């Protein structure tokens, strides 16, 4: 059963509520939000752009969750979830379009894939993502999923300098191929990066790492979104204790 999660941001005074996005109308809201975010920030080539939507064949196989502003009624954050059973019917996870995933079949326990996560620019703060994480926790708990996996993006507008610098940090602290190895089907081209070049982790990627997720290999170049996608894997029993409360999990 979905637990209503409402938070009031101390500065803006917004009231936010998590919800399951069931039905065609709610899905269209999610697709419209995705379009606004992805087209504006990545200049992405999106199916459904002529209708102001980001949609694809995976949408109908996924569960969709979101965060709504109770005062305006607007959907302000969303993500979609594809579980192992739906992936079996499809013949693949979405991530397998970009990566060869060695070890996926050997994972012990149910797997949930997260994707198309986006937050409206004016709502990018700890409160909004915490509400979204809380609803994700409900789905994880209900399904008994042991693994959460997906892709996190690094912008490539600078030709890949940020991606290379970010990957240097990720390799040093967050690389783990013990459970799964992700080989990109379209690797980034070689690029010399100065040793002193630093870069901030993109917010969503940082959020995953704080939860305890690991990267499982090198990034894949996504020309449609003009980003480098990094494959991440979060093992349920390795959640960072500091952030485990977002997932209502005992660790």
Swiss-Prot record:
Induction: Induced under phosphate limiting conditions.
GO BP: lipid metabolic process
E.C. number(s) listed in UniProt: 2.3.2.30
A molecular-function term among this protein's GO annotations: ornithine-acyl [acyl carrier protein] N-acyltransferase activity
Keyword set, alphabetical order: Acyltransferase, Lipid biosynthesis, Lipid metabolism, Transferase
Reactions that this protein is recorded to catalyse: a (3R)-hydroxyacyl-[ACP] + L-ornithine = a lyso-ornithine lipid + holo-[ACP] + H(+)
UniProt enzyme class: transferase
Recorded metabolic or biological pathway in which this protein acts: Lipid metabolism
A Pfam family per the record: Acetyltransf_5
Disulphide bond pairs: none
Function according to Swiss-Prot or TrEMBL: Catalyzes the first step in the biosynthesis of ornithine lipids, which are phosphorus-free membrane lipids. Catalyzes the 3-hydroxyacyl-acyl carrier protein-dependent acylation of ornithine to form lyso-ornithine lipid (LOL).
UniProt record similarity statement: Belongs to the acetyltransferase family. OlsB subfamily.
Database matches in PANTHER family: GCN5-RELATED N-ACETYLTRANSFERASE, L-ORNITHINE N(ALPHA)-ACYLTRANSFERASE
Designated name of the protein: L-ornithine N(alpha)-acyltransferase
